[in-house]
């Protein structure tokens, strides 16, 4: 049986330890590990009681009594998912030494900070509506006169990383920088329109806002109108943005990624990396490349068009039921679901690319047995992008490793099935199917079902 939660009073060494750690993470709900429980104190406790329907109690009867509540450690993921799903940042503070061997107070440290844009686990992703879609963390920067914005989008759950620059479309009115900072968004809607459309298109779960943008009333007004969760964050690294990206991707130039000539985009991308490294407290080894946010390849559909056509979201209840995506989505894998959503929102413009995609679809439409066999194999393939992301960041578990093993075991059979298709698009897919035999052998030897 688990021990009941114990709570330090304000004068105890444990409460002073909590106060020291809380001071380092003032904008989070601090889940403080005490034995078999996570406990929350003071204002954190009041918030948790309201949001999680817990019981508030106090330690002590005098004016220094400490309000607190707790949740069992083994059920922590469920409660954390609820808090993150409601937009809170949660710091996980663990006991980092065995209490049996501790000399005095057990050492505790924050091992991870969770927020809507930094989550990896399936239950957390479901809580923010990203089970079948991307979960982007956005980082925004701007040059001195707000004529160009840098936008970076990083999905830590898949490793996808995009960055680009957006013209501010500012009218040449002779405004000083101070006037620009103070002007509301409504004074010059053109200045923000392109940025607004990109934020609506990607719908990030969280937006990082550095100091120079936090001072701009029009920019803050824009984010508030979009009801986006914002996090104040400034780069804490010593490397300048370009060098930080070069270090991350282990390259001597960003030219191969298309970003060499976009310094504002580089700044936004570096900001996103800084934030994730500070919250995950570890390396981001699965983030191995970055792509340029290019719009020339797709038909540009503004938010009003996407909404009125009900491409991915119903006007009635906001779900996918009755939408084009809801009609088309028969995908069997997480990666397939994300890709289909992107295709629906980004229709191709180039005739040759459209025809290559149609050729591949026609192959499956014309061969019932091939289609059936391929779908049956895809059922055995997990969300490899997210499985690998959790493993690399140290957040994976035994179920993830079993799912990864099963997925890798299926790839040779999938490749053999697809070899009967002549379409160029499928040949390209086959070229990227890598069963990773050494990794598979390690998993098979290490896992006992």
What are these regions (language model features)?
Residues 2-363, 379, 383-392, 396-449:
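Charged catalytic and DNA/RNA-contacting regions of genome-maintenance
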Residues 366-371:
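Conserved interaction-surface patches within small, structured recognition/assembly domains
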Residues 375:
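Aromatic-lined, polymer-binding surfaces characteristic
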């Amino acid at each position: 049986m688990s021990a009941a939660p114990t709570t330090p009073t304000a004068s105890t060494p444990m409460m002073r330890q909590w106060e020291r750690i809380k001071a380092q993470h003032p904008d989070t709900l601090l889940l403080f590990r005490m034995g078999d429980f996570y406990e929350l104190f003071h204002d954190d406790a009041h918030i948790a009681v309201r949001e999680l329907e817990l019981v508030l109690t106090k330690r002590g009867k005098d004016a220094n009594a400490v309000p607190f509540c707790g949740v069992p450690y083994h059920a922590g993921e469920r409660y954390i998912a609820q808090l993150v799903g409601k937009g809170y940042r949660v710091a996980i503070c663990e006991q980092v030494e065995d209490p049996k061997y501790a000399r005095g107070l057990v050492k505790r440290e924050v091992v991870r900070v969770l927020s809507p844009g930094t989550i990896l686990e399936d239950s957390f992703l479901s809580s923010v509506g990203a089970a079948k879609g991307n979960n982007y963390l956005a980082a925004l920067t701007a040059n001195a006169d707000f004529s160009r914005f840098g936008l970076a989008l990083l999905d830590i759950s898949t490793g996808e990383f995009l960055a680009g620059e957006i013209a501010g479309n500012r009218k040449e009115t002779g405004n000083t920088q101070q006037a620009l900072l103070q002007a509301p968004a409504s004074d010059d809607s053109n200045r923000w329109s392109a940025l607004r459309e990109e934020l609506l298109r990607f719908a990030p779960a969280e937006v990082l806002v550095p100091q120079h943008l936090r001072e701009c009333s029009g920019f803050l007004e824009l984010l508030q109108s979009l009801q986006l969760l914002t996090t104040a964050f400034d780069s804490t690294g010593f490397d300048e943005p370009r060098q930080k990206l070069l270090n991350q991707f282990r390259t001597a130039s960003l030219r191969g990624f298309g970003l060499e000539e976009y310094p504002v985009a580089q700044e936004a991308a570096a900001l996103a990396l800084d934030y994730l490294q500070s919250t995950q407290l570890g390396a981001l080894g699965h983030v191995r490349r970055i792509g340029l946010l290019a719009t020339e390849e797709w038909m540009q559909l503004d938010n009003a068009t996407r909404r009125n056509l009900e491409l991915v979201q119903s006007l009635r209840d906001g779900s996918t039921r009755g939408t084009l995506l809801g009609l088309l989505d028969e995908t069997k894998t997480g990666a397939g679901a994300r890709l289909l959503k992107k295709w629906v929102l980004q229709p191709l413009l180039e005739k040759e690319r459209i025809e290559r995609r149609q050729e591949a679809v026609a192959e499956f439409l014309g061969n019932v047995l091939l289609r059936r066999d391929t779908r049956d194999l895809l059922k055995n393939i997990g969300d490899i992008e997210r499985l690998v992301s959790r493993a690399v960041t140290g957040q994976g578990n035994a179920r993830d490793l079993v799912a990864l093993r099963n997925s890798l075991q299926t790839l040779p059979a999938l490749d053999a099935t697809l070899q009967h298709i002549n379409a160029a698009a499928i040949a390209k897919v086959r070229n990227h199917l890598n069963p990773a035999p050494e990794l598979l052998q390690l998993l098979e030897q290490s896992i006992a079902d």
